[in-house]
Amino acid sequence: MKLQCTQENLDKALSNISRAVANRTTLPITQNVLLKANNGKLQLSATNLEMAINTWIGCEISDEGETTIPARIFTDLIKSYPNDNIDLNLNNNNLIIKCGPYNSNLITQSSEEFPPIPESDSLDPTFIISPSPFSKLINSVIFSAAQDQSRPVLTGVKFSITNNKLTLATADGFRLSIISFELENENIPEIDFIVPAKSLLEVSRILPFTKDDISIFMTKASNQVIFKM
């Protein structure tokens, strides 16, 4: 893998996916970020096994490839660099990083051990919604999701769609919050699913920086939801 990108774009991308990097884990590779260079873009991915975030930045690729690298060290290093072009060159298990007068070498780990992250390419969106109303919906209910892990189902936000109406609901045993929104999509199938409140909170933190509509996908096994923005 050999490529060139800007420090600004790489720094922003790492900042976005850092929310999904595992802090304490029995699977050490989830403390890494996945780097995958192909088709003129660098994909950066992170997961804590409950939530995953993918993001892409433009770059000039000389050699396609992929690897993983410790997220915290890599993020801090890129943040310390000046606003200039960055060269990334993977040599065996060493990632050689150059930015202006600065050179660094970081040890990598094979991407084969990185947990698979579901893709939306082969899926049709369950529904589409604009960032502003979606943010309002989340913020209107997320505060009353339970914190007590003894009843895991109450620590999530319930999504339900009936007659093209999206309803979000939370409850913690003392409070109940419900809000509904009429979707513009037609013929949306009726569906119910629960998203962990912690994961949905991270989605809401990205929404203010999103201009395009949000596409929500359910995986074929219906046990994972994908927010594409």
Protein language model regions, located:
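Structural preference for solvent-exposed beta-strand-turn elements
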Residues: M1-M229
